[in-house]
Design a protein with these regions (language model features):
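Surface-exposed, proline-anchored Ser/Thr-rich loop/turn motifs
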Residues: 296-314
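Surface-exposed, beta-sheet-biased, low-hydrophobicity segments with strongly acidic/polar composition
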Residues: 1-292
Length: 314
């Protein structure tokens, strides 16, 4: 149920609950990205209504709109393509999905309404009203209009973070990330599109951290210079493991090495050695720090990262 933020150089930087938030708002950058928490079973759908219809929406308007095929998902290839953003018109560079950027005022004005299915099964209507003066303004309510909340999230409260978080369940903001410059990898459950939306346990890299996957290779002798690094955050992802239903055990893909270029500019060799699954949530891996020429700077070391318990590194 936790999310661990990990520095290749300095180990775990934070290990926090991954079920206490519903929305995440981009703090740095210009995409005005807004994520939903699929790990917490939060589901997002377009309402198919104008913002002028906000007060007139009823439960009848949800009929046919909450089908699984209509679900909007965070993209697991980039932090900056959230569920609220993926309906953007690619032909309009000012369309950010939930709203449109005004070049004159430098504000984003919300032009879309959404239905959100909460982990409790409740249905909320959601309107991201604007982003102006570094503050997100948004509203949510029951679909019949009751229990409406109009609130804000200020970027200034989350300086140095990728995202600021909000819980609809408690009506509060959450500061749950370490500084964006202090971590390289996130270990957690997240939603992946697959052929259909599915919750996976895997590893996502931080923004500007590149990863190269080498497979099939000799794990001892492989050179990093033969493989092209990628900035897709799911390059490590979840497919380095698979569950064997015959033995009821997790199998780790052999002959697989990941080369991680971290926030500090160092290159690391990472080999996964185990996964605890639902038993303990542990990600087990071997890491080796490389110099700019690919020569080992220090001895390789095994690492045990627990998404639920604390990690231990030898």
């Amino acid at each position: 149920t936790n999310q661990a933020f990990y520095s290749m150089e300095n180990g775990e930087q934070a290990n926090v609950s991954n079920t206490d938030w519903d929305l995440a708002f981009q703090i740095t950058g210009f995409q005005a990205t807004i994520l939903v928490n699929g790990k917490n079973n939060v589901r997002l759908f377009k309402a198919g209504k104008s913002v002028n219809d906000w007060s007139a929406i009823t439960a009848a308007d949800t009929v046919g709109m909450l089908n699984p095929g209509n679900e909007l998902l965070n993209q697991d290839t980039s932090w900056w393509s959230g569920a609220f953003n993926i309906t953007a018109d690619a032909a309009n560079g000012f369309d950010l999905g939930w709203g449109v950027y005004d070049f004159a005022t430098h504000a984003v004005t919300g032009d879309s309404l959404f239905f959100m299915k909460m982990s409790t099964g409740e249905i909320k209507k959601v309107w991201i009203q604007s982003l102006m003066n570094n503050t997100y303004y948004f509203a949510y309510a029951n679909v019949d209009g009751s229990a409406e909340v109009n609130t804000t999230l200020s970027k200034s409260a989350f300086t140095g973070k990728n995202f600021g978080y909000y819980s609809i369940a408690t009506g509060t903001t959450l500061d749950r990330e370490p500084n964006k410059y202090t971590w390289d990898l996130s270990f957690a459950q997240y939603m992946s599109a697959l052929p259909f939306p599915y919750k996976v346990s895997g590893v996502l890299s931080n923004d500007s951290v590149s990863v190269a996957k080498a497979y099939p290779v000799d794990e001892q002798t492989v050179s990093p210079w033969s493989f092209t690094p990628s900035y897709y955050i799911n390059t490590i992802g979840y497919e380095w493991k698979a569950y064997d239903f015959n033995t009821n055990a997790w199998l780790i893909q052999d002959s697989t090495v990941f080369f991680v270029n971290d926030k500090l500019g160092f290159l690391w060799k990472v080999v996964f050695t185990g996964f605890g699954g639902s038993a303990n949530g542990n990600f087990e891996f071997y890491k080796e720090k490389l110099s700019a020429t690919g020569v080992q700077e220090n001895g390789g070391m095994p690492a045990l990262l627990g998404v639920a318990p604390n990690p231990a590194t030898n």
